[in-house]
C-alpha cells in the first residue's frame, strides 16, 4: 500500500492509505499420469482410477486402455499440492498391493 500525506479540513496533515490492486494469477496446474507396466492388472488400474480420481467405471476403463496402448494416461489435472498428494496415495497403495504401477505428475 502506498502512503501519502494529505491535508484535510479537520486536520492539518493526515495519512491516507491507498489500496494498490495486485494482479493475481491462477496457480500452476499439474497432470497426474499413470504409466504402463507389464505386471499391474488392468482391473487394479481401473480400481485406482475410481477410488482416487472419482472416475466412473466406463471412464476409468477408457483411461486404463489409454495407459495400456499409449504407455501413459492422464488421470486428472490439479494444483501442485493436490497432484502430489494423489501421486503419493496411488504409489503407496500400488506398492502395498505388490504392484509396480507408477504414478507421476507433470506441469500441464
UniProtKB/Swiss-Prot annotation:
InterPro entries on file: ClpS, ClpS_core, Ribosomal_bL12_C/ClpS-like
Name of the featured protein: ATP-dependent Clp protease adapter protein ClpS
Pfam families: ClpS
Subunit structure: Binds to the N-terminal domain of the chaperone ClpA.
Role this protein plays: Involved in the modulation of the specificity of the ClpAP-mediated ATP-dependent protein degradation.
Organism the protein comes from: Ralstonia nicotianae (strain ATCC BAA-1114 / GMI1000) (Ralstonia solanacearum)
Family the UniProt entry places it in: Belongs to the ClpS family.
Gene Ontology process terms (BP): protein catabolic process; proteolysis
Lineage: Bacteria, Pseudomonadati, Pseudomonadota, Betaproteobacteria, Burkholderiales
Domain of life assignment: Bacteria
Gene: clpS
NCBIfam families referenced in this protein's UniProt entry, alphabetically: PRK00033.1-5
